[in-house]
Each structure stands twice: as C-alpha cells, then as structure tokens.
Curated annotation (Swiss-Prot):
A Pfam family of this chain: DUF4686
Iron-sulfur in keyword set: no
Organism: Homo sapiens
UniProt tissue specificity: Expressed in brain, kidney, pancreas, placenta, liver, thymus and prostate.
Bias (Basic and acidic residues) ranges: 1-22, 131-191
Annotated protein name in UniProt: Coiled-coil domain-containing protein 30
Record's compositionally biased regions (Polar residues): 106-115
Length: 783
C-alpha cells in the first residue's frame, strides 16, 4: 500500500511539474506577444510622428498668406485712390455741365471747357490702366483667396487637434482683420452712392449736350450770315462733343465693371465675415480645450512621477520574484533528489526484506542442521539493518512531509507571484500608454510653442513691413506693369501648387486612412488576444481548483496513511516483543541443544563401546556355541533348548512371563520323556552348566559395570529404566521358577539352572538391543 501511494504521489508530482512547465511556456509566449505588440506600437508611433512632422510643415506654406494679405491691403489703398480720382472726375463733369449751360457766353468759357475736355481725354488712359490693373489684381486675388480658404480648413482641423494655443496669440491679428473688414464694408457702402452720383452727372451731361446741339442748330439758322467763323466753332464743338460722348460711353463701361467688382468684393466680404465668425467660435473652443489640456498636463505630470516610482518599485519586485523562483527551482531539485533517495532506500528495504525471508528460511534450515551460531550473528546484523532501514524510512517520511508543506507554500507563493506579475504587466502597459500619450502631447505643445513664437516674430515683421510698405507704395505703382507679367507666371505656378497641394492632401488622407485601418486591426488583434488571455486565465483557474481538490485528496490520503502508519508501528512493536521472546526461547533451546550435543557425543562413545562389547560377546557366544556343539556331539541337545533362543524371546514383560511358563511346562514335559533316555549324562550336563553359569555371571557383571557409568551421564533414562525393569522381571521369574521347582520335585536342578542361565542371557541381549533402538529413536525425534 505504501509503495502504491508513493507511486501515486510521484505521478502527481510529475503532473504538477508538467503543469508548471506549461505555465512557464504560457508566460514566455505572453511576454513574446507583449514584446511584439510593443514593437508594433513603436512602429505606429513612428508613423504618427512622421505625420505630425508633415502637419508641422504645413504652416510653412501658410506663410504665403501674409503676402496675399499685404497685396489685399495694397489693392484696398489703390481702390481708395481710384475713388478720389473718380470724385475729381465728377467735379470736372459738373464744371462741364456749367459750361454747356453757359455755352452762349464768352469764348473764354469755351477755352476753359476745351481745357476741361482735354483733361478727361488726358486722364482716360490713366484711368483705363488703373482699372485694368485693378481687374488683374482682383483676378489674382480670387484664386489666392480660394487657395487660402482651402488651406485654412485643414489648418484649422490640425490646429483644433494638435495646435490649440494659436487662438490665444492670433486674437490680436484677427481683431485687426475685423477692423479692416469693417473699413472695407464702409468703403463698399460708399461706392454705390458715388456711382449713383456719377450716373446722374452723366445724364445731366447728356442733356446738356443735347441742348447744346439744339442751340447749335438754332445758331446755324441764325448765323448763316457768318458762315466762316460760326462754322468753325460748330465743327470744333461737334468734334469735342463726339469725343465727350465716347469718353462718357467708356466711363459707363468702366462704372459697370466697377459695380460688378464691388458686388464680387461684397460677396467675398460676407464669406470672410462668416469665416471670421467660425474662427472666433473655434478660438473659443480651442481656449476651452487649452484649459482642459493644461489640467490634463498637470495631472499627467503627476501621474508620470507616480508611475515612474511605481515602475521602479515593480522592477524591484520582479527581481525579488525572480530570486524566489530560483529558490523554488532549487527546492524542487532537492525534492527530486530526496525522492530518488526515497526510492533507493525503498529498494534497499525491499532487498532487506527479501534477505530477511531468505535468512529466516536459512534459520529454519539451520535449526534442523544445528548451525545456530552463524544464524544468530546474521540475524543480529539483519535486525540492525532493519532498524536502520526503519529509522531511515521514518526520517525520509518526515523529510517528505516537510517538503510537501514547503511545496504547498511555494505553490501559494508562485500563484501570488503570477498574480503580481499580471498586475505589474497591466500597470506597465498603462504606464506605457500614458507615457506615450503624454510624450505626444508634450511634443504637440512644444511644436505649438515654437509655432506661436514664429508667429509672434512674423507679426512683428509684418508690422515693420507695413510701415515700410507705406513708404514703398509710390514705388509699387511703377512696378505694376512688371508684376502683371509675373502674375501670369504666378497663376501657372499657383495652379501647379494647387494641384500638388491637392495631391499631397489626398495622399495624406490615404495615409490617415491606412493608419486608421492599421489601428483598428491592431485594436481588434489586441481584443482577440485579451479574450484569449482571459480564456487561458479561466482554464488556469479551473486547473488550480482541480489542483486544490487533488491536494485535499492528498491530505485525506496522508491522514489515512498516518493512521495506517500508527497501526504498523504498533504491529512492529508487537513483532519486536515476539522477537525478544523468541530470542529467549532460542537461547534456551541453544543451550539445550549444546547440552544434547554433548550427551549425543557421550552416547555415541557409549554406543561404540557397546558395539565393541557386542562383538566381544558374539565371539564369546560363538565360542560357547562351538563348545556346546562339541558337547552336543557327545550329548544330544534337547528340543527346549532350540525353542529358548535369544532371537525368539518376546520383548514385553507379560509375554516373557507367559513364554517362561510355556517353556517351563514344555521343558518339564520333555524332561519327563527324555529323562528315561539320558540318565547317564547328568554329570556332564552339570559340568557344562556350571561353565555356562560362570560365563553368564561374568558377562552380566561386565554389562552392569558398563551400564552403571551410563546412568551417571545425562542420558534420557528410558533404556536404563527398562534394563532395571527387565532385571527385576528376571528376578521375579527366577523366584517363580524356584517356587515351581520346589513344587515339582520331579524336575532336576540341572534343568532349572539351564533355564535360569538361558533367561539371563536373553535378558541381557534384549536390554542391549532396546537401549540401541531407544537411542536411534531419540536422534530421529531431535532431527
């Protein structure tokens, strides 16, 4: 049972090791995935930084706006100058009206009117050039304003997202622009009134011309008498009037074109107003966002400081955890070594048990073969080995239990460490996200600061340039013709730039879409990975619960094992007590065996002596038989002698008595029949019987002398007792025969002596055989 339980524990240990390896591999894969995600994030960050740099380069293109604004200011001033010139022309037309009304007056007035008419003729090419230049400038400004609007829209979106501080420093410039727009509106409201005045004046001029023509016709009728001087004046006046009509027609065309331009400028002003209102709203939003961003910056700085401290603390914890993991691995290795030692000791114990069984068998065999000394020494050694093995088993079991407790604690520490690692990884991810966001915000804010500083510098430069431009206005009027040629080039360049800008804008949109697509894909991948990690966490939790259940089972099994161990210890104690008792019995048996060995040796010596004596007796008996044969040749032997042989005598007492009586009766009967046939041989028989009695007495004395020292030895005593009993029986038989002989006087004393001698010899030989058989039986029983 203990071996099976140990195997179960070892299998559970192997399973737990495999689970630990799987967890370690899962952690490695998670760390690799985190590294890959961090690399992808760095790549996306680098791409975003490139895009931000491209967006930062866009304000460089917006610097051309300032040049267009300067050109607009110049055009506004030129418009004001043209308006002053138009006022002058209106005054001149008023003078012409007065001249036409007073056409009948002196020729001096005509001369003045000619001068005045000549003045507008001289002013016409100037006005035409100015109007054409104005048209060209407005045509130049229209695409520039369109480009400016197109540029302002993405710039505003960029400013709202990444440059929220521009509104604070552009407030002054926007206020100046608002003032300029109001002045333009006032000028535009003034321009239509002036145009109406010009039209009225032109209508008056037309009426005056018609009146002058009618007056000229009447003067032709009246002045027919003076054809020479009057006709010249008329022709001159008619030519002047035609020229004035042409000039008026040209002026009307110019006025219509000016009205169209004014309408176009009004529409542009309305668009600019709407754009300014939108910009103001956006500025307000940007201010609010700036405040929020500043607060977030402060919070983020605080968070950065706290997170850096936490990050350092987490790194220290990670190092400590790594050290604990190393210690845990070392403890696991030591546990493995101890388990191997346990297995080796168990194998040694099994071998020792097998040896014990073999030795027990040998002990039994040694008891049979009487080799107890060597068995006792080996048994003592084996007992010592068993004690050492039991002690080693107890120590190893204690170490195993301690290591199991340590392992449980280590597993708990590992679980806590895994949880701490997960929390630290989450915190690291949050820290990286917050740091990246804060770095991007800081970069954006630094870029905004740089841009605002550049704008301040530009604004100061613009102020200085405005002062210089006021001085250079006179020079610019001369350079207008050169600028016209350059304007065509600029238009072409603008078209090219617009196309390039649109292409870049489209490319940027495509890049942004790609970045968005990548970001969405990365977010989806992260979500999938997060779900996978959550599933793995659930599986691990389920496994941990299973491990806890297994640990509970193991504890229950340990309790049962402890109970079984106690029972086994009690059994071992009982067995030791039995072993002690067996030792005492074995020692007593050994002492007896030694004693019996000594007795056996003595008995063997006695048996050798007896065999020698038996051989000696057989020789004597042969010699007696030989002598008897010689005597029988001389004297025949009776039948009763053949019946009274030693081999045919019964061994027991009763049978001996019965046999003796039967022999006695048969001998008496035979003697009665044979007494008549052998009366003469009595004397010879007496002599032979005396010889036999002497020999038998000698033999009896020798046998008794040899048996008496045997009685003093430590023999079992059965043979001696039986020998004495047989002697007593022989004495009783002799006494009975004596009684019978006394009763039957017919029997001769010779027959009695022969029977007594034969019986004594028979008893001696039977006693010797019985002692020899008893010794063999004792040896067999001992074996």
């Amino acid at each position: 049972m203990s071996q099976e339980k140990n195997e179960m524990f070892e299998s559970e240990w192997s399973k737990e090791r495999e689970r630990e390896k799987q967890l370690a591999s899962g952690l490695d894969t998670a760390e690799k995935a985190l590294k890959v995600e961090s690399e992808e994030l760095q790549k996306s960050k680098s791409e975003l930084i490139c895009l931000y740099n491209e967006v930062h380069n866009l304000p460089g293109e917006s610097e051309s706006k300032d040049h267009f604004l300067i050109a607009c200011d110049l055009l506004q001033r030129e418009n004001s100058e043209l308006e002053t010139k138009v006022l002058k022309l209106s005054q001149e037309f008023a003078q012409l009206n007065h001249f036409t009304l007073g056409g009948k007056t002196a020729p001096s007035n005509l001369i003045t009117s000619e001068n005045t008419c000549k003045d507008p003729e001289s002013n016409e090419p100037i006005l035409e050039t100015e109007i054409q230049s104005r048209k060209e400038e407005t045509e130049e400004l229209c695409p520039k304003l369109g480009e400016r609007k197109q540029k302002e829209i993405p710039e505003e979106s960029v400013k709202e997202g990444s440059f929220p501080r521009e509104g604070q420093k552009e407030e002054g410039s926007q206020q100046n622009r608002d003032m300029k727009d109001e002045e333009k509106e006032q000028q535009l409201t003034m321009k239509p009134e002036e145009i109406v005045r010009l039209r009225e004046e032109l209508s008056h001029i037309n009426q005056s011309l018609l009146q002058s023509q009618s007056s000229g016709d009447s003067s032709d009728d009246s002045g027919a008498q003076h054809p020479s001087s009057g006709e010249k004046l008329k022709y001159n006046q008619q030519g002047e009037v035609q020229q004035l009509h042409q000039n008026l027609h040209r002026l009307q065309i110019l006025c219509n074109s000016a009205e169209n331009e004014l309408r176009y400028e009004r529409g542009q002003n309305l668009d600019l107003k709407q754009h300014n209102s939108l910009l103001q709203e956006e500025n307000i939003k940007i201010k609010i966002e700036l405040k929020h961003a500043q607060q977030k910056l402060l919070d983020s700085t605080k968070m950065c400081s706290s997170l850096t401290a936490e990050y350092k603390h987490c790194q220290q914890k990670i190092k400590e955890l790594e050290l604990e993991v190393l210690k845990h691995t070392q403890s696991i290795k030591s546990q493995n070594n101890l388990q191997e030692k346990l297995v080796q000791e168990k194998s040694k114990v099994a071998d020792a048990e097998e040896k014990i069984l073999d030795l027990q068998r040998k002990l039994e065999h040694a008891h049979k073969v009487c080799l107890t000394d060597t068995c006792i020494s080996e048994k003592q050694q084996l007992e010592e080995k068993i004690k050492e093995a039991t002690q080693n088993e107890a120590k190893v079991k204690q170490q195993y239990q301690e290591e199991q407790q340590k392992r449980k604690l280590l597993y708990q520490n590992v679980d806590e460490l895994h949880r701490q690692v997960r929390t630290l990884q989450d915190k690291e991810n949050l820290l990286e996200m917050t740091c990246s966001q804060q770095q991007s915000r800081i970069q954006q804010q630094e870029a905004l600061l740089k841009q605002l500083e550049n704008e301040k510098r530009k604004y100061d430069e613009h102020v200085k340039s405005n002062q210089e431009l006021s001085e250079k206005l006179s020079k610019l009027q001369q350079e207008k013709e050169a600028l016209r040629e350059e304007y065509l080039r600029l238009l072409k360049l603008l078209n090219v730039h617009v196309r390039n800008y649109n292409e870049k804008h489209h490319q940027q949109k495509v890049k942004l879409q790609k970045v968005k697509y990548r970001l969405t894909n990365e977010v989806e991948l992260r979500d999938k990975r997060i779900n996978q990690f959550e599933d793995e966490i659930g599986i691990l939790q389920h496994k941990i619960e299973k491990e806890k259940a297994i640990q509970d089972q193991i504890t229950a099994q340990n309790d049962t094992l402890l109970l079984e161990k106690r029972k086994l210890q009690e059994q071992v104690i009982e067995q030791e007590q039995l072993i002690h008792s067996n030792k005492w019995t074995i020692s007593s048996i050994q002492s007896r065996v030694l004693y019996m060995d000594k007795e056996n040796k003595q008995l063997q010596e006695n048996s050798l002596r007896l065999t020698q004596q038996i051989g000696f007796l057989e020789r004597i008996i042969r010699s007696i038989h030989i002598r008897r044969g010689e005597n029988l040749k001389e004297f025949p032997v009776p039948k009763w002698w053949h019946r009274g042989k030693l081999a045919s005598l019964p061994p027991t007492k009763k049978q001996k008595e019965i046999y003796s009586t039967e022999v006695f009766t048969s001998n008496n009967a035979e003697l009665q029949h044979e007494d008549e046939s052998v009366p003469e041989a009595t004397e010879k028989w007496k002599h032979s019987e005396q010889m036999e009695t002497t020999i038998s007495d000698i033999l009896e004395s020798e046998v008794v002398n040899e048996i008496l020292p045997l009685s003093n030895s430590s023999f079992s005593g059965k043979g001696l007792v039986e020998s004495f009993a047989s002697l007593q029986e022989t004495e009783e038989i002799k006494s009975k025969e004596a009684m019978a002989s006394s009763k039957s006087p017919e029997k001769s004393p010779e027959n009695l002596v022969c029977s007594q001698n034969s019986e004594a010899g028979y008893i001696n030989v039977a006693s010797l055989k019985e002692t020899h058989g008893i010794q063999e039986q004792d040896q067999k029983s001992e074996l």
